[in-house]
C-alpha cells in the first residue's frame, strides 16, 4: 500500500498559502503583516508564531514549489517564537542567512557553521531574532532515501543526522546558500518586474515567455529535475559534516576517500568515457549527475573523483562544456536557428544558453551563426 504521509508531503510541495495548486517550478512571493499570517503562508506545516517584540510586523516568503521538494526563503522583521512541525514523510533543512543573527532550535544555538534539520511529524521550537532571514528546503522522505541509495550508494540513516543541529564546513554552507539564492532570485526579479519600470517588466516578460516555451517543448520536467538534483547534492554534501568528523558511511572522511581512490586508472577512464557517450546519446536534454550515477552504478563521489582525475574538473562542468561544444559545431555548420540548436543540445533557457556560450567562446551564439 502507498504511504499516505508521502502523498501528503508531495501534494503540499505544489500548493500555495490559499491551498490552491500552483505550477511546479514557478516561483511564488507572499508578504504578511501579521505573524500568524506569516505562519499560515508556509504550506505543509503545523505552526504558530508568537511576536516577542513591539512594532508592526512584516514578513516575506519567496518559495519555489517543485515536484518532490519546496525551496523557500523566509524573512521576518521581529523576534519570534515559532512552534513548528512539518507534516508527513518529509524533512526540513533550515539554513540561516549569514550575518542576520543566530537562531535557536529547541533552546540550542545554530551558529554560522551549522544548519537545522528536522523530520516530519516531530514538533520543534525556533527562536529567531529581528530582521532575520533563513533558507528552507522541505524534501519528501522517499526522495531522500532513493537518492542516498541510488546516487550516493549509502545508507540514508548514516548520511542524514538525527540531531536538530548539523555542523558543516563554511564552504559547503555557502555553496548551498548560493544555490538556493540563485533559484529564488528568479522569483524576486519577477516580482520587481511586475511592480517596476518598463525595462523590468520587459525582462520579467522575457523570462516568463522562456518558461512558457520550455513548457510547450516538454522541457519543464527536465529543468525541475536539474534543480532538484543540484539541491539534493548540496544537501548531502552539507550533511557529510565539517570535514573533521565527516561520516565515512556517507562518503566523507579518510575511509570514504580511500574507497573512492581505489578505482584503477583504467576504470576511471572507462567511467568518464561511458558518461560522455551517455550524454551524447541523450543530448536533447541536460543529463544530470544523479542520472549518470544510476546508469553507471557508481556513487556521486566516485563519479566526481573520476572526472577530477581524468579531466581535472567536476562532471557537471565538463558535461556542460561538452554540450556547448556540440552546439558550437552545429552553429558553425548552420544546422539550424540558435533556438533550434540550443534545444537540440538540451539548453531550454535561451538567455542562460547565450550567457554560457559567450562565457565559453567569447561571442554570442547569434554571432557564431552569422559568421558561419
What are these regions (language model features)?
Residues 86, 268, 320:
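Short, conserved glycine- and acidic-residue-centered signature motifs
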Amino acid at each position: 500500500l502507498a504511504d499516505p504521509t508521502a502523498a501528503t508531503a508531495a501534494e503540499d510541495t505544489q500548493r500555495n498559502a490559499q491551498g490552491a495548486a500552483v505550477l511546479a517550478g514557478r516561483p511564488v512571493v507572499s508578504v504578511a503583516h501579521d505573524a500568524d499570517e506569516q505562519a499560515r503562508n508556509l504550506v505543509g506545516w503545523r505552526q504558530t508564531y508568537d511576536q516577542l517584540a513591539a512594532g508592526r510586523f512584516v514578513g516575506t516568503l519567496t518559495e519555489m514549489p517543485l515536484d518532490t521538494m519546496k525551496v523557500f526563503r523566509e524573512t521576518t522583521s521581529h523576534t519570534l517564537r515559532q512552534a513548528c512541525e512539518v507534516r508527513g514523510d518529509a524533512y526540513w533543512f533550515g539554513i540561516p542567512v549569514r550575518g542576520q543573527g543566530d537562531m535557536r532550535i529547541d533552546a540550542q544555538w545554530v551558529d554560522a557553521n551549522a544548519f537545522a534539520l528536522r523530520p516530519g511529524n516531530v514538533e520543534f521550537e525556533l527562536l529567531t531574532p529581528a530582521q532575520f532571514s533563513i533558507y528552507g528546503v522541505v524534501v519528501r522522505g522517499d526522495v531522500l532515501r532513493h537518492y542516498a541509495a541510488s546516487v550516493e550508494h549509502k545508507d540514508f540513516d548514516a548520511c542524514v543526522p538525527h540531531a536538530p543541529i548539523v555542523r558543516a564546513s563554511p564552504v559547503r554552507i555557502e555553496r548551498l546558500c548560493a544555490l538556493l539564492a540563485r533559484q529564488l532570485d528568479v522569483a524576486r526579479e519577477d516580482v520587481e518586474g511586475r511592480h517596476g519600470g518598463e525595462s523590468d517588466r520587459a525582462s520579467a516578460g522575457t523570462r516568463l515567455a522562456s518558461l512558457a516555451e520550455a513548457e510547450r517543448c516538454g522541457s519543464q520536467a527536465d529543468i525541475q529535475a536539474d534543480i532538484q538534483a543540484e539541491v539534493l547534492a548540496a544537501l548531502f554534501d552539507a550533511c557529510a559534516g565539517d570535514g573533521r568528523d565527516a561520516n565515512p558511511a556517507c562518503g566523507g572522511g579518510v575511509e570514504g576517500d580511500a574507497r573512492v581512490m581505489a578505482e584503477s586508472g583504467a576504470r576511471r577512464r572507462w567511467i568518464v568515457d561511458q558518461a560522455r557517450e551517455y550524454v551524447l546519446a541523450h543530448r536533447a536534454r541536460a543529463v544530470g549527475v544523479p542520472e549518470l550515477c544510476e546508469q553507471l552504478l557508481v556513487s556521486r563521489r566516485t563519479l566526481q573523483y573520476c572526472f577530477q582525475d581524468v579531466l581535472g574538473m567536476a562532471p557537471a562542468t565538463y558535461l556542460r562544456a561538452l554540450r556547448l561544444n556540440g552546439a558550437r559545431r552545429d552553429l558553425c555548420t548552420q544546422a539550424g536557428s540558435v533556438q533550434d540548436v540550443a534545444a537540440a543540445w538540451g539548453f531550454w533557457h535561451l538567455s542562460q544558453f547565450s550567457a554560457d556560450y559567450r562565457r565559453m567562446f567569447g561571442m554570442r551564439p547569434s554571432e557564431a551563426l552569422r559568421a558561419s
